[in-house]
Amino acid sequence: ARECPGKQEWPELVGEYGYKAAAIIERENPNVRSIVKHERSGFTKDFRCDRVWVVVDSTGVVVRTPRVT
């Protein structure tokens, strides 16, 4: 398993607005940068302890559990 510091996932943010969720994530784990992306966007496959994808639909609402990826 990969060991990264701080909170790793935020299931409670599904249904929240993406940019609000991103701010909450960065406040709860200052080691990460949260990046809001549309669910149909391309995503890199590399793993990074300092990145969280915040995946939103066309209305800007989080549709997948944000987690360190």
Curated annotation (Swiss-Prot):
GO biological process: response to wounding
PANTHER family linked: PROTEIN, PUTATIVE, EXPRESSED-RELATED (PTHR33091), SERINE PROTEASE INHIBITOR, POTATO INHIBITOR I-TYPE FAMILY PROTEIN-RELATED (PTHR33091:SF83)
Domain of life: Eukaryota
Keywords, alphabetical: Disulfide bond, Protease inhibitor, Serine protease inhibitor
Site (Reactive bond): residue numbering on this chain: K45, D46
Gene source species: Amaranthus caudatus
InterPro entries per record: Prot_inh_pot1, Prot_inh_pot1_sf
Name the UniProt record assigns to this protein: Trypsin/subtilisin inhibitor
Function of the molecule: Inhibitor of trypsin, chymotrypsin, subtilisin, etc.
Molecular function as annotated in GO: serine-type endopeptidase inhibitor activity
Cysteine-cysteine disulfides: C4-C49
Family affiliation: Belongs to the protease inhibitor I13 (potato type I serine protease inhibitor) family.
One protein family per Pfam: potato_inhibit
Keyword Disulfide bond: yes
Transmembrane stretches, start-end: none
Gene3D superfamilies xref list: Trypsin Inhibitor V, subunit A
